[in-house]
């Protein structure tokens, strides 16, 4: 029996959402029980023996991964959401998109000063959303001790961007090209 890698579970959709884009669809990974379990195991592997107070996930697929990782670690989960999606008091950070600006938010009491946080998402492209998430966590006094992704798109520079912030970046696989 041959064993599939995480990359083998990810489908590529050509020309989505725009012509010339190769969309890396991780929903096929999530749909396969074995593939999903392998992904969670591998996301956690570099952090064996480390203690986290919280896991933060970026909207939306980071919620799926982050929830599973938090469950495995027996810790709390913090959703980092698009503006206007969280009830109650929040703090926000804006970041640049290719055409315009976006804003992410977190509850202002989601992370306590000094808590160690693992940031999780499905895909690292330019790193803008992850950087905004890191800034939110740090504004609350949390310490991001790792950033874990299923897919890295190295040609878009996200890893370099996060590493320039002093972040440890872990990705299960990389896809070259756009």
Swiss-Prot record:
Key words, A-Z? Cytoplasm, Glycosyltransferase, Purine salvage, Transferase
Q: What EC numbers are recorded for this enzyme?
A: 2.4.2.7
GO molecular function terms here? adenine binding; adenine phosphoribosyltransferase activity; AMP binding
Q: Which reaction does it catalyse?
A: AMP + diphosphate = 5-phospho-alpha-D-ribose 1-diphosphate + adenine
Report any one BP term from Gene Ontology: purine ribonucleoside salvage
> Which pathway does it operate in?
Purine metabolism; AMP biosynthesis via salvage pathway; AMP from adenine: step 1/1
- List where in the cell it is found: Cytoplasm
PROSITE patterns named among the record's database cross-references:
PUR_PYR_PR_TRANSFER (PS00103)
One GO cellular component term: cytoplasm
Enzyme class, UniProt record, top EC level: transferase
Question: What is the first-listed, main subcellular location in coarse terms?
Answer: cytoplasm
Subunit composition and interactions: Homodimer.
The record describes the protein's role as: Catalyzes a salvage reaction resulting in the formation of AMP, that is energically less costly than de novo synthesis.
Cross-referenced PANTHER family, in alphabetical order?
A: ADENINE PHOSPHORIBOSYLTRANSFERASE (PTHR32315:SF3)
Q: Which family does it belong to?
A: Belongs to the purine/pyrimidine phosphoribosyltransferase family.
What is the name attached to this protein's record? Adenine phosphoribosyltransferase
Q: Gene encoding this polypeptide? A: apt
């Amino acid at each position: 029996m041959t064993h599939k890698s995480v990359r083998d579970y990810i489908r590529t959709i050509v020309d989505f959402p725009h012509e010339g884009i190769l969309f890396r669809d991780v929903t096929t990974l999530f749909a396969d029980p074995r593939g999903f379990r392998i992904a969670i195991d591998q996301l956690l592997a570099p952090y064996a023996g480390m203690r986290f107070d919280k896991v933060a996930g970026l909207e939306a697929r980071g919620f799926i991964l982050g929830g599973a990782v938090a469950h495995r670690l027996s810790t709390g989960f913090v959703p980092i959401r698009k503006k206007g999606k969280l009830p109650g008091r929040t703090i926000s950070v804006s970041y640049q998109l290719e055409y315009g600006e976006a804003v992410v938010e977190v509850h202002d009491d989601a992370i306590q000063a000094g808590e160690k946080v693992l940031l999780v998402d499905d895909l690292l492209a330019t790193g803008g959303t992850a950087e905004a998430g890191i800034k939110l966590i740090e504004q609350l006094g949390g310490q991001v001790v790792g950033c874990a992704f299923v897919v890295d798109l190295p040609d878009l520079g996200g890893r370099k961007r996060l590493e320039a912030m002093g972040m440890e970046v872990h990705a299960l696989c990389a896809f070259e090209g756009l």
